[in-house]
């Protein structure tokens, strides 16, 4: 039959209220805040009756230490007490008030309101899940690289590798081979057939493609321009001058040349007067006026210089004068 013992929270309250352990006191009893002396034995040295009396009392209460049967081990007592405090759901550490250094190091805790039954169940299930996850991590960490390599070397591969391929792919491959027609082997002959490419010879230039042609010159009757019309007038005048017969005459002691056949000089120049005729709106009006001006100039000129000009006169050098129609 198991021995029943007091839980840690009521046992701790009883130890604080007894004032038998030095340093274990209430800081704020209303808020259930208390402190525990937490001196480091390795740095400052321990006094079992003073610094480790709370941890020893808890070891005696849990049955892990009995006076006279085991050697005292204050470090183990302190570690067991710390684990028990951290596992309590209704006690938490106030870290901003704790002092972890020096000979007067203390830890401050707060007692929370008691948990209900449902809260205790949730807390228990959470702790069990944490324990399982820790165990899994520990088992994974224990496996060394040597054991992993040994497992790989001991594993044997099967001789039949057909199971590695996908069955569907093999079926598709068989269907494709069935649909593909069988190719007959190609026979290579040493004789090659004669073949040629028809080549059409094209001349280098386009002169052979078209016959040489000369454009006909335009006839004089078809290609008449204004310049040709102007050139005809002097030619006609020259012909008239060549056909006409120039006759010297003397009027009032002045010599003149007359080319009107059948007309006596006296009858012509006796009644000759320099009267301006009215302008005739005809194509030969300008020519008539020009001839009249020429005769007027000849009449007014001195006849003595004509004697020197009669012998060397050259008709082609005479200025062309348009005649009246």
Swiss-Prot record:
Any one GO cellular component localisation term in the record: cytoplasm
An example Gene Ontology biological process: positive regulation of type I interferon production
Expression induction: Induced by HPV16 E5. Induced by HIV. By interferon (IFN). Induced by N-methyl-N'-nitro-N-nitrosoguanidine.
Positions of crosslink type Glycyl lysine isopeptide (Lys-Gly) (interchain with G-Cter in SUMO): 275, 299
Notes on activation and inhibition: Activated by MYD88.
UniProt modified residues of type N6-acetyllysine: 78
Description of how the protein assembles with itself and partners: Monomer. Homodimer. Interacts with EP300. Interacts with MYD88. Interacts with PIAS3. Interacts with SPOP.
Known role: Transcriptional regulator which displays a remarkable functional diversity in the regulation of cellular responses. Regulates transcription of IFN and IFN-inducible genes, host response to viral and bacterial infections, regulation of many genes expressed during hematopoiesis, inflammation, immune responses and cell proliferation and differentiation, regulation of the cell cycle and induction of growth arrest and programmed cell death following DNA damage.
Name of the protein in its database record: Interferon regulatory factor 1
